[in-house]
Swiss-Prot record:
Ranges per topology, Cytoplasmic: 584-637, 852-1009
Region listing for Interaction with CBLN1, in residue ranges: 21-436
Subunit structure: Homodimer. Interacts (via extracellular N-terminal domain) with CBLN1 (via C1q domain), and more weakly with CBLN2; the interactions mediate the trans-synaptic adhesion complexes also with neurexins and are required for ligand-gated cation channel activity.
Protein name stated in the entry: Glutamate receptor ionotropic, delta-1
Main location (coarse class): membrane
Role, per record: Member of the ionotropic glutamate receptor family, which plays a crucial role in synaptic organization and signal transduction in the central nervous system. Although it shares structural features with ionotropic glutamate receptors, does not bind glutamate as a primary ligand. Instead, forms trans-synaptic adhesion complexes with presynaptic neurexins and cerebellins, regulating NMDA and AMPA receptor activity and influencing synaptic plasticity through signal transduction.
Transmembrane segments: 563-583, 638-658, 831-851
GO terms, biological process: modulation of chemical synaptic transmission; negative regulation of synaptic plasticity; phospholipase C-activating G protein-coupled receptor signaling pathway; regulation of postsynapse organization; regulation of postsynaptic membrane neurotransmitter receptor levels; social behavior; synaptic signaling via neuropeptide; synaptic transmission, glutamatergic
Gene name, Swiss-Prot/TrEMBL: GRID1
Length: 1009
């Protein structure tokens, strides 16, 4: 018996030792703000203790330590305390800072560490970059899979074809986690904006309205149409509510909420509070079959955690589920360790001592855990070589619309780490939602956009016009119907003092109409409260004005030149004439002192002016001019007249061939500078606000709009403005009033006017346009915009424009019946050069005349010899008598007449005694001459001769001696000087038959006949 006892004692001791080692002690560290981690951990240990399939006789004990959030020092202290108690593994659920500190400790002590990362404040988590172990042995295992949100978001924006969007994140989110996403988005050419959201979300939106202008808010609203929210569910709900309340969100906005942890009730809250489309990305776990929903690997899970009807599961966070599966993974490893009988006893470790050695069973326990494979609440869990759990799956939910249930959520696709995206994220075409719908349309009568076509009693009004045609084309393409009615006040929409809106805009804001269409322009103020489609027609402001009446002028031939030019030309004619007269008088005085010549044709004032006028009209009339001064004067005058006549001809041709409306007002600048005509627009209209904004802008350098606004806003607009466009058109037709309004409207009024009495001028350049107004946040805006662009591409809009604004209508705006010459009269400054040329010529002529007078007077005084006297007629008579006395017996003069020319002879000195004149009756020779300035009649002498007498001189009645001019005495002394201003005086001799002249003339005489 004793021998049997001794033989069984070692076995009994071994069994006792195994039973003692079968008590499994686990340490746990949680943050104090995670109360559910503690409860779930205890629930997991309780479930495993009751499961005999995993641990038959083994019992799990645990020690839990609670630390502050993000306190690594406290985490290390509590972990050392647990190691002193002796633990087989450490399970933690903390942030990244505490996890890094615990990793270093567990790596040094060889204690397996199962780490579950928590979401910071419910915000999306970012990856924890754990420090690698120096010896390459990492004892920390990440139970929760790495963050894959960047991959999901990149695939999502790619599927949605976003090119520009904004990402909002809160203070709890580590923006460094987006670095990889931003790098990939940059390579794809995406425009990504980041904006941090403070905890006081209402303050964020309030600051936007205080720091941004209206244009900036409109751009910010466009940015919000595509947004990704990296916020907590509560933060996202508050953010969307503020965006909707401040009218920064619209029905065509698309919100993408990305967070691994969000419950179904939270999703529904987001969907119902948001305007537009909502997409939610969250992590999901595979659901088990109904008969196995509470069983995982033969492990019975508490119904609180596996039965959705209990409701407790919906309240758990993802970190709680991974914490439960981490305990299950440890229990599975302990079970396999016990089966393999490779159990290592727990050891008390003192991490403060330097001599403390790590647990020798840590490596074996770590390998067993890493080889484990379980299926828990989160699905499959196992660890790869990098100590991470790779299995993760995401669900992508999207909003749906229905007539019965309104807005709801449906599953669009899933994403997992192995297969990627499974499903389609493309938005369902919105056009299908309009099929069969009836929209309420509000409008305002405005020709030719909207007009009443028929008005039958008892039936709704029928409308026609350009905007109605566009609406019909959209209804046909999209398959919807519409009911149209007029705005009660007949206005487009203007913000009142109480911040409310009237007109069509007010109808949209109050939800009484789905859309508004007419000649409504897209303005920043209107776009802040309603949405607009793409413009279907450009907009500009024009001036409707009455055409000027036709003016007939019989003096239009004077139009090519300005009055000052005509005055200068009229003054130049007598000035030049007087100068020519003076020059001729000077020349005549000089000539009288020598020969007393006959006055020239320009010696009188009226004759000189007549010569000038003849040259001006290019008809001649001037006598021969030999003086240098006269030639300079006439040359300058001829050049002057050539330029003047050529310019007159060219400009007159321009006046006759180029003609258009001669209206003094052609631009807004012309309108602002005149005061004879009043002008205005419709009060409280878009045009009214346009001039107000331009006229009151201190940065506007052009003062034109400021002057226009002063006139338009006089007396609050009551003096010059009208209440409706039709009133303004009627007022412009009456005359003396310019109506400023949309070019499209006033052009139609001018084209269809019965009298064609008005025209449109002064188009302004504007970036505005006519669009379709919809309720703020309407989901149909993009659909209408797309169809409008299609109508533009196909040319259908151009066809509709030609229908209502024909190029050849009743009135032609390109030509006018009252067209007048549009050329410009040449001003005096344009002719200053030619008048300068004339003045220089006249001055030069005066100078030359003075020099010529001085030169000739001095030269004649010095060079005239005493013996070189000009013979007069008496000398000729005496010479002829002497010749006849000497040779009368045998010299005869031919019966032909003898003409003596080239004898411009001056008289002798008054004191000289003349020889008596002898008569030769028998020769019957007649001598005739004309003496200028001495007498007004001719003097003749007759010499008689016998009929048989002959003169052997080569003279005949038909022969004329050439005229001669001499300034020096000839060698034979027979030539006389002739004054350059005197004309040759012919002398005729009529011989009588029987007269005999001497046979030859004495060459010694100084008279030539």
């Amino acid at each position: 018996m004793e021998a049997l006892t001794l033989w069984l004692l070692p076995w009994i001791c071994q069994c006792v030792s195994v039973r003692a080692d079968s008590i499994i002690h686990i340490g746990a560290i949680f943050e104090e703000n995670a109360a559910k981690d503690d409860r779930v951990f205890q629930l997991a240990v309780s479930d495993l203790s009751l499961n005999d399939d995993i641990l038959q006789s083994e019992k799990i004990t645990y020690s839990i330590k609670v630390i502050e959030a993000n306190n690594p020092f406290q985490a290390v202290q509590e972990a050392c305390d647990l190691m002193t108690q002796g633990i087989l593994a450490l399970v933690t659920s903390t942030g990244c800072a505490s996890a890094n500190a615990l990793q270093s400790l567990t790596d040094a002590m060889h204690i397996p560490h199962l780490f579950v990362q928590r979401n910071p404040g419910g915000s999306p988590r970012t990856a924890c970059h754990l420090n690698p172990s120096p010896d390459g042995e990492a004892y920390t295992l990440a139970s929760r899979p790495p963050v894959r949100l960047n991959d999901v978001m990149l695939r999502l924006v790619t599927e949605l074809r976003w090119q520009k969007f904004v990402m909002f994140y809160d203070s709890e989110y580590d923006i460094r986690g987006l670095q990889s996403f931003l790098d990939q988005a940059s390579r794809l050419g995406l425009d990504v904006s980041l904006q941090k959201v403070d905890k006081n979300i209402s303050h964020v939106f309030t600051s936007l309205f205080t720091t941004m202008k209206t244009e900036e808010l409109n751009r910010y609203r466009d940015t919000l149409r595509r947004a990704i929210l990296l916020l907590s569910p509560q933060g996202a709900h508050s953010f969307i509510n503020e965006a909707v309340e401040t009218n920064l969100a619209s029905k065509d906005s698309h919100w993408v909420f990305v967070n691994e942890e969000i419950s179904d009730p939270e999703i529904l809250d987001l969907v119902h509070s948001a305007l537009g489309r909502m997409t939610v990305v969250r992590q999901i776990f595979p659901s088990a079959k109904d008969n196995q929903k509470c069983t995982r690997n033969n492990h019975r899970i508490s119904s609180l955690l596996c039965d959705p009807q209990e409701g407790y599961l919906q309240m758990l966070q993802i970190s709680n589920l991974y914490l439960y599966d981490s305990v299950l993974m440890l229990a599975n490893a302990f079970h396999r360790k016990l089966e393999d009988r490779k159990w290592h006893s727990m050891a008390s470790l003192n991490c403060i001592r330097k001599s403390t050695k790590p647990w020798n069973g840590g490596r074996s326990m770590l390998d067993t855990i890493k080889k484990g494979h379980i299926t828990g609440l989160t699905g499959v869990m196992e660890f790869r070589e990098d100590s991470s759990n790779p299995y993760v799956q995401f669900e992508i939910l999207g909003t749906t619309y229905s007539e019965t249930f309104g807005k709801d959520m449906r599953k669009l696709a899933t994403w997992d780490s192995e297969k990627g995206l499974n499903g389609s994220l493309q938005e369902r075409p919105m056009g299908s939602r309009l099929q069969g719908l009836t929209l309420k349309v509000v409008t305002v009568l405005e020709e030719p956009f909207v007009m009443v076509a028929e008005n039958i009693l008892g039936q709704p009004k029928r409308y026609k016009g350009f905007s109605i045609d566009v609406l019909d084309a959209l209804a046909k393409a999209l398959g919807f119907k519409y009911e149209i009615y007029q705005a009660p006040d007949g206005r487009y929409g203007h913000q009142l003092h109480n911040t409310s809106w009237n007109g069509m805009i007010g109808e949209l804001i109050s939800k009484r109409a789905d859309l508004a269409i007419s000649a409504i322009t897209i303005t920043p103020e209107r776009e802040s409260v309603v949405d607009f489609s793409k413009r279907y027609m450009d907009y500009s402001v024009g001036i409707l004005i009455k055409k000027p009446e036709e003016k007939i002028s019989i003096f239009s031939l004077f139009a090519p030149f300005d009055f000052a030019v005509w005055a200068c030309i009229a003054a130049a004619i007598p000035v030049v004439g007087v100068l020519i007269f003076v020059l001729n008088r000077i020349q005549a005085v000089r000539a009288q002192s020598a020969a007393q010549p006959r006055p020239s044709a320009s010696a009188t004032l009226h004759s000189a002016i007549w010569i000038v006028y003849g040259a001006f009209v290019q008809q001649g009339g001037e006598s021969s001019v030999n003086s240098m001064a006269m030639r300079i004067v006439m040359g300058s005058w001829w050049l002057f007249t050539l330029i003047v006549c050529s310019s007159y001809t060219a400009n007159l041709a321009a006046f006759l061939t180029v003609s258009r409306m001669d209206n003094p007002i052609r631009t807004f600048q012309d309108l602002s500078k005149q005061v004879e005509m009043s002008y205005g627009t419709v009060r409280d209209s878009a045009v009214y606000e346009y001039f107000r904004a331009k006229g009151t802008n201190p940065l506007e350098q052009d003062s034109t709009f400021a002057e226009l606004w002063r006139t338009i806003s006089k007396n609050g607009g009551a003096d010059n403005c009208v209440s409706s466009p039709s009133e303004g058109i009627r007022k412009a037709k009456k005359g003396n009033y310019a109506f400023l309004w949309d070019v499209a409207v006033v052009e139609y009024a001018a084209l269809t006017d019965d009298d064609c009495s008005v025209t449109v001028i002064g188009n302004s350049i504007s970036s505005k346009g006519y669009g379709i107004a919809l309720q703020h946040g309407s989901p149909y805006r993009d659909l209408f915009s797309q169809r409008i662009l299609e109508l533009q591409d196909t040319g259908d809009l151009d066809v509709l424009k030609q229908k209502w604004w024909p190029h050849m209508g009743r009135c032609d705006l390109t030509s006018h019946a009252s067209a007048q010459a549009d050329g410009k009269s040449l001003k005096l400054h344009s002719f200053a050069g030619v008048f300068c040329i004339l003045a220089i010529g006249l001055l030069l002529a005066c100078l030359v005349a003075a020099l010529e007078l001085w030169w000739n007077s001095n030269r004649c005084h010095q060079e005239t010899p005493k013996e070189d006297k000009e013979v007069n007629l008496e000398q000729v008579h005496r010479r002829m008598n002497s010749l006849m006395d000497e040779d009368i017996a045998h010299k005869q003069i031919s019966p032909a007449s003898i003409e003596l020319s080239a004898l411009e002879m001056g008289g002798l000195a008054p004191t000289q005694t003349l020889e008596p004149t002898r008569e030769y009756q028998n020769t019957q020779l007649s001598v005739s001459t004309f003496l200028p300035e001495q007498s007004s009649h001719g003097t003749s002498r007759t010499l008689s001769s016998g009929p048989s007498s002959n003169l052997p001189l080569p003279l005949s009645s038909s022969a004329t001696m050439p005229s001669m001019q001499c300034k020096h005495r000839s060698p034979n002394g027979g030539l006389f000087r002739q004054s350059p201003v005197k004309t040759p005086i012919p002398m005729s001799f009529q011989p009588v038959p029987g007269g005999v002249l001497p046979e030859a003339l004495d060459t010694s005489h100084g008279t030539s006949i």
